Each structure stands twice: as C-alpha cells, then as structure tokens.
C-alpha cells in the first residue's frame, strides 16, 4: 500500500481515545497526531512519553458521567481531567503560552493553545454527556485538525 508515513494518525472514543493518547505518548515517532472523543485518559497516560512534539485534540462533553471532563476515580484508577492532558501537550509541544477560545458549533467551545510546534486543541461540548457528536461533527473536526499536521 502507498501509505504516507508522515500522515499517520490515531483516533478513538472512550477507551479508544485513551488508547490514542497512550499512542501519542509512547509512539510519537510513528504518529503525526491523535484525537480522542470522550477519552478515558487514565493516569499515567501522559507520563514517560517520548520527548517529541505531536498534535493532540480532545472533544469532550462537560457533563460526561463515564469519563468526566474534570476527572474522577474509576475502578480505583484516576481518570485525568481533560485540562491536565491539554497542559501536558502544551509543555510537550513547546507552546508559547495562552489560548485562543472561540465557538465551535452549537453549544461548544474550541480552546487552542498558542505558538505550538504541533497543534493542541480541545473542543468542550457544553452540557453534553459521553457521546459521539454530530454538531459539531466529531469526525469532521478531527479530520480538519489532524489533516493540518504531518511529521
């Protein structure tokens, strides 16, 4: 197959989103970027990572009861707040500091880190639960973000 090895991405929902984040941590030499929807970001998903920049996006509902936006303890393990993961990718990607915040479709806010080697972005879907979104479209948002990044 004719695969562009500079444009390999990982995506997933729930534990699949967590898997994408683990891939970003330990296989940043392979992936150009990752994105998770309602990701289950169990600690230590962002520890012991390769010291390489990688694009990161999360789409997450603020009322998610399975993998809460602000984190929780589930089955005796800590699920990280989305903001913790965002900050870890800001550091990893050498972001200049500060964020841009703007609407992202109906009842959603896009938060993008400034001045990064690779993009770092979260779409907060206000009042939404553990869900795959169609407004904003999770698939369209992930592709629009990831397709801007290559190795």
Labelled PLM ranges:
Residues 69-80:
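Short, flexible/disordered intra-domain loops and linkers
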Residues 64-67, 130-132:
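Acidic catalytic loop of the alpha/beta-hydrolase fold
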Residues 35-43, 61-64:
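Active-site nucleophile loop of the alpha/beta-hydrolase fold
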Residues 2-3, 26-29, 48-52, 113-119:
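Extracellular/periplasmic catalytic domains that process cell-envelope and extracellular macromolecules
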Residues 29-39, 54-55:
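A conserved short beta-strand
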Residues 14-19, 39:
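Active-site loop->helix "elbow" adjoining a glycine-rich segment at hydrolase catalytic centers
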Residues 55-59, 80, 90-151:
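C-terminal catalytic histidine-bearing segment of alpha/beta-hydrolase fold enzymes
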Residues 1-15, 25-30:
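Gly/Ser-rich "nucleophile elbow"/oxyanion-hole loop immediately N-terminal to the catalytic nucleophile
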């Amino acid at each position: 197959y004719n695969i562009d090895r500079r444009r390999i991405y990982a995506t997933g929902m729930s534990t699949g989103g967590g898997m994408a984040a683990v891939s970003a941590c330990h296989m940043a030499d392979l992936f150009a970027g990752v994105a998770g929807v309602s990701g289950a970001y169990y600690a230590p998903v962002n520890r012991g990572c390769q010291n390489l920049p990688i694009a990161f996006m999360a789409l997450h509902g603020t009322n998610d009861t399975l993998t809460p936006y602000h984190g929780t303890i589930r089955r005796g393990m800590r699920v990280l707040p989305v903001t913790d993961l965002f900050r870890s990718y800001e550091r990893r990607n050498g972001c200049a500091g500060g964020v841009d915040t703007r609407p992202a479709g109906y009842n959603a806010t896009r938060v993008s880190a400034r001045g990064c080697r690779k993009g770092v972005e979260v779409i907060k879907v206000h009042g939404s639960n553990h869900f795959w979104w169609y407004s904003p479209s999770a698939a369209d948002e992930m592709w629009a973000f990831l397709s801007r990044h290559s190795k």
